[in-house]
Amino acid sequence: MTPLIFVTGGVVSSLGKGIAAASLASILEARGLKVTMVKLDPYINVDPGTMSPFQHGEVYVTDDGAETDLDLGHYERFVRTRLSRKNSVTTGRIYQNVICKERRGDYLGATVQVIPHITDEIRRCIDEATASFDVALVEIGGTVGDIESLPFLEAIRQVRIERGAERTMFMHLTLVPYIAAAGELKTKPTQHSVKELRSIGIQPDVLLCRSEQVIPDSERRKIALFTNVSERAVIGCPDIDVLYGMPLELRRQGLDEIVIDQFKLSGTASLADLSEWEDVVDAIKHPLDEVTIAVVGKYVDYQDAYKSVGEALKHGGLRQRTKVNLKWVEAQDLEGSDMAALKDIDGILVPGGFGDRGFEGKVLASRYAREQRVPYFGICYGMQAAVVDYARHVAGLEGANSTENDRQSSHPVIALITEWRTTTGEVERRDEKSDLGGTMRLGLQEQRLKAGTLARELYGRDVVGERHRHRYEFNNRYRTQLEDAGLVIAAKSMDDTLVEMIELPREMHPWFLACQAHPEFLSTPRDGHPLFIGFVKASRARKAGGKLLREVCV
């Protein structure tokens, strides 16, 4: 059985369970262990695919097309294991599975209850996602004490009874607040949080104590005494200035050794080599250049909606020792044709989105970048905005639009995808009446790049795979007309039916590229992504007056 580390949170939400868990996973991976991660989310939605970005933030997409919590993005940025729909489990999915089994008669007429049926299904999902790994980390969303989390906590309590301490570990993340008026850290919230956890039968093995300051040894001893946790296993997690430095901090305090000792993995695990993370932190702390990128979106008041985009831009910068400053621009603010927000920036990125609100602002951002020769990177809706701009203002297709926003458009250059092949080769069909949830073109899809294009130069190969999440697509009826007007179709699906990337000729624009997929989902701090690296480099070149001041790469 795979050893399991269950990560829970207490006192308040948003303490960073996902980052802490992913950081530990990265250390264990660096020790030669095969690691995976699972997120258990207590909400009743089947997945976050139809949830508002203002409430939930980004919907992260895996290779197999699962629409998941943004924490899976953190996981994949810290560990090299590629995750799937098995790694994201919600209350909605659990209940859906149980109800389907009940309807089929799988329970043989039994009364279906939270215990054992719901908890058994939770345990089955955990087992399915973690089989064949050396270690798995399972994060339980929410905060201890939330009624929604109780079935998950009961399920992991049962797992501990079944597997024992040598195959399970409970890691609890709490807050140790600093009270300025008293001038001291307070441990009482942590004590009460552990008391709440123990009341449902779970005794933490490790405490991760979040705080603004370093926790003194005297306070760590106090926490250990009142929570029945070894002092060695009370780990301080002070605020740090570089997120990707967390693996180094946890390694310094020996968290991985606690795991290795409890699971008796010393014969399997090697010494941790965290040199890659040291290089990442060094590149972030000591940049040699700096650029400002305008991100023109429609959810900019809640930047978690673009979490992977922001991180991918920073990754693209750190691969060149360049600090990337993000200027968040509300797309609607551009619709009065006031482009002041786009002055004095080095590049423009237009990310994905849905619906007509703000779309015209994105079109205007594309036009501004095209006419002012500012590096432009369009992603998903950002590509569609670029196509609409080009159709209207270069190809002369007055009224060109997406049918998502105007079904009566005289020139629907972007239209609903009605048919495509999935990753398994099956044909899927959709229409305007299809359910919103889980009905998009989703997951990793291969595409063929056109020789001689900027895209082909950046990737360095002919065929690439990127993750998708969209319903609307470039309308092939206008492909020839737009190409005749100068637009370059830089990539198409493997069956030649779907336009995947567009760009402008380099004699027309120094760097103008847009893609229908979401490359941000494959960017990591250790490797970056070719498109983001190229975009940041082009932005540096613009800032330098057409040529790079420094050619640096880590």
Swiss-Prot record:
<dbReference type="GO" id="GO:0005829">
    <property type="term" value="C:cytosol"/>
</dbReference>
<feature type="active site">
    <location>
        <position position="520"/>
    </location>
</feature>
<comment type="similarity">
    <text>Belongs to the CTP synthase family.</text>
</comment>
<feature type="binding site">
    <location>
        <position position="404"/>
    </location>
    <ligand>
        <name>L-glutamine</name>
    </ligand>
</feature>
<feature type="binding site">
    <location>
        <position position="222"/>
    </location>
    <ligand>
        <name>CTP</name>
    </ligand>
</feature>
<dbReference type="GO" id="GO:0044210">
    <property type="term" value="P:'de novo' CTP biosynthetic process"/>
</dbReference>
<dbReference type="InterPro" id="IPR017926">
    <property type="entry name" value="GATASE"/>
</dbReference>
<dbReference type="InterPro" id="IPR033828">
    <property type="entry name" value="GATase1_CTP_Synthase"/>
</dbReference>
<protein>
    <recommendedName>
        <fullName>CTP synthase</fullName>
        <ecNumber>6.3.4.2</ecNumber>
    </recommendedName>
</protein>
<comment type="pathway">
    <text>Pyrimidine metabolism; CTP biosynthesis via de novo pathway; CTP from UDP: step 2/2.</text>
</comment>
<feature type="binding site">
    <location>
        <begin position="186"/>
        <end position="191"/>
    </location>
    <ligand>
        <name>CTP</name>
    </ligand>
</feature>
<feature type="binding site">
    <location>
        <position position="353"/>
    </location>
    <ligand>
        <name>L-glutamine</name>
    </ligand>
</feature>
<dbReference type="GO" id="GO:0005524">
    <property type="term" value="F:ATP binding"/>
</dbReference>
<feature type="region of interest" description="Amidoligase domain">
    <location>
        <begin position="1"/>
        <end position="265"/>
    </location>
</feature>
<keyword id="KW-0460">Magnesium</keyword>
<feature type="domain" description="Glutamine amidotransferase type-1">
    <location>
        <begin position="292"/>
        <end position="545"/>
    </location>
</feature>
<feature type="binding site">
    <location>
        <begin position="186"/>
        <end position="191"/>
    </location>
    <ligand>
        <name>UTP</name>
    </ligand>
</feature>
<feature type="binding site">
    <location>
        <begin position="381"/>
        <end position="384"/>
    </location>
    <ligand>
        <name>L-glutamine</name>
    </ligand>
</feature>
<dbReference type="Pfam" id="PF06418">
    <property type="entry name" value="CTP_synth_N"/>
</dbReference>
<dbReference type="GO" id="GO:0004359">
    <property type="term" value="F:glutaminase activity"/>
</dbReference>
<feature type="binding site">
    <location>
        <position position="13"/>
    </location>
    <ligand>
        <name>CTP</name>
    </ligand>
</feature>
<keyword id="KW-0315">Glutamine amidotransferase</keyword>
<feature type="binding site">
    <location>
        <position position="139"/>
    </location>
    <ligand>
        <name>Mg(2+)</name>
    </ligand>
</feature>
<feature type="binding site">
    <location>
        <position position="13"/>
    </location>
    <ligand>
        <name>UTP</name>
    </ligand>
</feature>
<keyword id="KW-0665">Pyrimidine biosynthesis</keyword>
<comment type="subunit">
    <text>Homotetramer.</text>
</comment>
<feature type="binding site">
    <location>
        <begin position="146"/>
        <end position="148"/>
    </location>
    <ligand>
        <name>CTP</name>
    </ligand>
</feature>
<comment type="function">
    <text>Catalyzes the ATP-dependent amination of UTP to CTP with either L-glutamine or ammonia as the source of nitrogen. Regulates intracellular CTP levels through interactions with the four ribonucleotide triphosphates.</text>
</comment>
<keyword id="KW-0547">Nucleotide-binding</keyword>
<dbReference type="GO" id="GO:0042802">
    <property type="term" value="F:identical protein binding"/>
</dbReference>
<keyword id="KW-0067">ATP-binding</keyword>
<feature type="binding site">
    <location>
        <position position="471"/>
    </location>
    <ligand>
        <name>L-glutamine</name>
    </ligand>
</feature>
<feature type="active site" description="Nucleophile; for glutamine hydrolysis">
    <location>
        <position position="380"/>
    </location>
</feature>
<dbReference type="GO" id="GO:0003883">
    <property type="term" value="F:CTP synthase activity"/>
</dbReference>
<keyword id="KW-0479">Metal-binding</keyword>
<feature type="binding site">
    <location>
        <begin position="14"/>
        <end position="19"/>
    </location>
    <ligand>
        <name>ATP</name>
    </ligand>
</feature>
<feature type="active site">
    <location>
        <position position="518"/>
    </location>
</feature>
<dbReference type="InterPro" id="IPR027417">
    <property type="entry name" value="P-loop_NTPase"/>
</dbReference>
<dbReference type="InterPro" id="IPR004468">
    <property type="entry name" value="CTP_synthase"/>
</dbReference>
<dbReference type="Pfam" id="PF00117">
    <property type="entry name" value="GATase"/>
</dbReference>
<dbReference type="InterPro" id="IPR029062">
    <property type="entry name" value="Class_I_gatase-like"/>
</dbReference>
<dbReference type="InterPro" id="IPR017456">
    <property type="entry name" value="CTP_synthase_N"/>
</dbReference>
